UniProtKB/Swiss-Prot annotation:
Family stated for the protein in its record: Belongs to the ABC transporter superfamily. ABCG family. Eye pigment precursor importer (TC 3.A.1.204) subfamily.
Protein name: ABC transporter G family member 10
Location(s), subcellular: Membrane
All residue ranges annotated as the ABC transporter domain in the record: 19-274
Species of origin: Arabidopsis thaliana (Mouse-ear cress)
Keywords on record: ATP-binding, Membrane, Nucleotide-binding, Transmembrane, Transmembrane helix, Transport
The organism's taxonomic lineage, starting at the top: Eukaryota, Viridiplantae, Streptophyta, Embryophyta, Tracheophyta
GO molecular-function term, one example from the UniProt record: ABC-type transporter activity
Transmembrane segments: 351-371, 387-407, 434-454, 468-488, 491-511, 563-583
GO cellular component, one term: membrane
PROSITE patterns the UniProt entry points to: ABC_TRANSPORTER_1, ABC_TRANSPORTER_2
Record has Transport as a keyword: yes
Length: 590
């Protein structure tokens, strides 16, 4: 990518960026096989053209709006300009200041705001922007706070700075304010280029105008290059737009000023109705307008590979800057992410307050049901064995309630790591470390009443070991859910997969079916069962050298080896979850 153009532009900013596409085309399908019928015959999926020979440009100190009817390719073009498309076949050229786009350099100077906001609902506006600044800037906390304060003033969010973001129907800031916060998250590193998908979508006319006016001020005062997609612009919003790229069926039918669009409609024989703005009418008749013809250009089918961008750039005589490093070390990232996660956990009722109450109340209720069962001679072993099986079922199955939180975190993680705000490793480490003390509190709230009320072995070492097992069970199940939340596409699929596996683990734990009765081809499930090892630990802790243990083929030495196996499950699921998340983020970033 070429060194920034230095030119006197509005607002005193010396560095400017111009984006340009030449004969840009984007196709999907064609090479992806699919089953064409019930017989399983393999056929090739039909290729679909999303963009065709798109040539347009976006200049500094201007708002360029990509418009067109639904399905015209607006979002696809914007994502390509942001370097976000990770699949499909792209040909043509994407130029930044006249040179082929270089991914790392371009990522450093640009900001991309998707249509869907991805914000933590329980953080305040100021906290959201502060954590974004701490993660993306090489600066001290004091300097980050000063920058965030200025940014909040610039965004007009002073009155809601200490208000929580909120989500959906929950109390929080308005839709327009939430949209400005999303824009602010991308502005903390002061990008020269801002790309926004549907900034006015879902907003009332006043909020939509407020957002677009804010963007216009940035072009005037700071000379930023702003590209946005828009679907239904009002008169006042249209006044803020400098250039329009009108698409129809993936082709450009107009690229220029609002006035030139008016002239094209006029010369095409159309009459703009009264009280209808020119762009709104142009979108309605886009299919009848003649596409702009451009000269053919040599295809660059390797779009999306930084190697190609770099080789093109170096061959053009440019100097490649290796500035794609992160702003913080892994340790610093873990500290910042851990602090943010801690606030989210303690403010999320279903994760902390509800979970703490659930553990305390469940411990008391179970203790009252199995009251002093440990002191009963007759059928005591059967009752205690059933008690151990039940509490493990309860503890392992109740962890699925954290799945929505993990899925929300994943969405934000993928968005933040796509801009290299931090490493995936730092997120996994912070998430793991934060849950260790939190689940310790939950385990003690559950274990303390239930252990003494049931009347299990009345010795301190027995209680401490029982509490340790409960704690590790919670950590193990939490890691299991975290791992599969990285894998599944949505909450419904996640619930189905996790519940199904938990049921299988319980079935093969050795409680319902003895190990020697399990078919050979299913024995691996016995050893993978999350129920097997804690169940054996609780039995050994209660009966120790009893003849009953020998009947169950259990040895007292397994008391600690089983804990080691459970710890390896925790590490294994976290490591597997890390690789799944890393691959997801890698695909998004590429």
């Amino acid at each position: 990518m070429e060194l920034p153009v230095k030119a006197p532009i509005p607002g005193g900013r010396e560095i400017s960026y111009r984006l340009e596409t030449k004969n840009l085309s984007y196709r999907i399908g064609g090479n992806t096989p699919k089953f064409s019928n019930l017989c399983g015959l393999l056929s090739e999926k039909e290729e679909k053209v999303i963009l065709k020979d798109v040539s347009c440009d976006a200049r500094s100190a201007e708002i360029t709006a990509i418009a067109g009817p639904s399905g015209a390719g607006k979002t696809t073009l914007l994502e390509i300009l942001a370097g976000k498309v990770s699949h499909g076949k792209v040909s043509g050229q994407v130029l930044v200041n006249g040179r082929p786009m270089d991914g790392p350099e371009y990522r450093r100077v640009s900001g991309f705001v998707p249509q869907e906001d991805a914000l933590f609902p329980f953080l305040t506006v100021q906290e959201t922007l502060t954590y974004s600044a701490l993660l993306r800037l090489k600066t001290k906390r004091k300097d980050a706070a000063a920058k965030v304060k200025r940014l909040i003033q610039e965004l007009g969010l002073e009155h809601v700075a200490d208000s929580r973001i909120g989500q959906g129907s929950r109390s929080g800031i308005s839709g327009g304010e939430r949209r400005r916060v999303s824009i602010g998250v991308e502005l903390v590193h002061d990008p020269n280029v801002i790309l926004i998908d549907e900034p006015t979508s879902g907003l009332d006319s006043a909020s939509a105008l407020q957002v677009v006016t804010l963007l216009k001020d940035m072009t005037i005062k700071q000379g930023k290059t702003i590209v946005l997609t828009i679907h239904q612009p009002g008169f006042r919003i249209l006044e803020q737009i400098d250039r329009i790229v009108l698409l129809s069926n993936g082709m450009v039918v107009q690229n220029g000023s609002v006035y030139s669009l008016h002239q094209k409609i006029k010369f095409s024989g159309h009459q703009i109705p009264r009280r209808v703005n020119v762009l709104e009418y142009a979108i309605d008749i886009a299919g009848s307008l003649e596409p702009i013809r451009t000269q053919s250009c040599r295809e660059i089918s390797c779009y999306g590979h930084s190697k190609t961008w770099k080789s093109c750039y170096i061959s053009a005589g440019g100097e490649l800057h290796q500035s794609d490093s992160h702003s913080n070390s892994v340790l610093e990232e873990v500290q910042i992410l851990g602090q943010r996660s801690c606030k989210n956990i303690f403010r999320t009722k279903q994760l902390f307050t509800t979970r703490a109450l659930q553990a305390s109340i469940a411990g008391l209720i179970l203790g009252s049901i199995y009251l002093n069962v440990g002191n009963q001679k007759k059928e005591a072993k059967v009752l205690r064995t059933g008690f151990f099986a039940f509490i493990l079922t309860f503890l392992l199955s109740s962890t699925t309630e954290g799945l929505p939180i993990f899925l929300q975190d994943r969405r934000i993680l993928m968005r933040e790591t796509s801009r290299r705000a931090y490493r995936v490793l730092s997120y996994v480490l912070a998430d793991t470390l934060i849950f260790i003390p939190f689940l310790l509190i939950i385990s003690m709230l559950f274990a303390t009443p239930v252990y003494w009320l049931v009347g299990l072995r009345r010795e301190l070492d027995g209680f401490l070991y029982f509490s340790l097992v409960i704690w590790i069970v919670l950590l193990m199940s939490n890691s299991f859910v975290a791992c599969f939340s990285a894998l599944v596409p949505n909450f419904i699929m996640g619930t189905s997969v996790i519940s199904g596996l938990m049921g299988s683990f319980f079935l093969f734990s050795g409680y319902f079916i003895a190990k020697d009765r399990i078919p050979v081809y299913w024995e691996f499930m016995h050893y993978l069962s999350l129920f097997k090892y804690p169940f054996e630990c609780l039995m050994i802790n209660e009966y120790r050298g009893d003849v009953f243990l020998k009947q169950q083929d259990l040895k007292e030495s397994q008391k600690w080896s089983n804990l080691g196996i459970m710890a390896s499950f925790i590490v294994g699921y976290r490591v597997l979850g890390f690789f799944i998340l890393w691959y997801r983020c890698y695909r998004t970033r590429s």
